[in-house]
Amino acid sequence: MQPGRILLSCAVLVALTLPAGAAPDEDLLGKAAGYPIGKAANWFFDEGVRVGSFSRLDSFLPHYILRKAAAPLTLPKAASEPKLTYRFEKQTYSLDDFLAHQRVTGLLVIKDGQLLAERYQYDRTAADRFVSHSMAKSIVSLAIGMALTENKIASLDDTVAKYVRDLAGNPYGETAIRNILRMASGVPFNEVYDGNDDSSKFNRIRLTRDSITALRAFPTREVEQGTQFHYASNQTVVLTLLLRAVTGTSLSDYLTPRLWQPMGAEADATWIKTRDGTETGSGNFNAILRDFGRLGILLANDGAVGDRQIVPKDYLLDATDWHRQPDAFKPNKATPYFGYGYQFWLFPGEKRRFALLGVYGQSIFVDPELKLVLVITAAAKNASVGKEPFARERDALWRGIVGQYGSW
């Protein structure tokens, strides 16, 4: 038996022997202490404060607020919940089985703008604002598309330094915006979430100095830009600085009247800000589960709300359709599974399906043809879940739901 199957079998066995109503690893995640909230120094790595911190991040870190819509988009519930099942490791499972197996804090399934299923675990509720982690990168991409349409950015083939003069002479500044969107600057950057990687180094400099200084700590390019996908969160920070330069305002203030309110958010969102006043950008956007669902609906409708086009459609297609990507960025090429667009992950398969993904299991999966959205927030054991049972079962769940309404 393969190691992954052994892990899954053990996980399922543990789930079956848990007390009725118990969530996976709830004791490790702090149930006895009421799922405590961490501090700036430990919230990202400390398992014992993970659930609390991931749903209360803005209670202890400085942030911007994106105010809710005056008239929220109605999210009607289905008259009765359909039986949603999926096949995994030669077994058939339900939504509730998925929650019993995995450290899911919240889950939504939406079809044609209608809420089919909604679940919460670990005492989380519909009022909690869940952290996006790197799903925020896709939101930054949407802002780039809007700024391009408003002619605040002349061309995606312009270099970043044309707009962010402080990055002149630095490889990030001399990279085309399009290549930054594709995580293809060619600048080496190690991101493994162990506290000692380049990502940690970058964040430490950013916390004590500023974003420009942190970016200048990476002064060399090793691969020709635009030729190779290499995931690096600091490239989204480059886009965040670019947006501040061209809009003259915070990213949150820019997006509130252009995205958050027009899409019909029912609650305020928050975005953690850094020492220099810019949003984290690459992560730390916080919203209630249903508003993440509304974002998914917007994307499933190709950026439109009714007759109003919120996100430029052609930009969104460029961002999310693997057929529009160079060969190196297509599924099974950028990574062994996903392709990569403009800060979006692209599923393999002939049809256009894409994802917003964040560490520890945060996910929004979108199928525009089926108008189908799956939202998952989580507190997975490890930051990188790609090769773990969590990711494999999550993919099986998505494929199972897609298969009930269409075909892969």
Regions found by a protein language model. Name each.
Residues 9-17:
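Bacterial N-terminal signal peptides
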Residues 266-269, 317-373:
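Active-site Gly/Thr loop motif
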Residues 131, 150-188, 220, 245-282, ...:
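Active-site helix/loop module of the DD-peptidase/beta-lactamase fold
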Residues 23-37, 42, 353-408:
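Structured C-terminal helix/loop/strand segments within mature extracytoplasmic catalytic/sensor domains
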Residues 20-125, 153, 182, 396-408:
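N-terminal leader/targeting segments and the immediately adjacent pre-domain N-terminus
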Residues 141, 235-242, 281-304, 362-378:
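Active-site-proximal alpha-helical segments within enzyme catalytic domains
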Residues 113, 131-156, 180, 239-243, ...:
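Active-site SXXK
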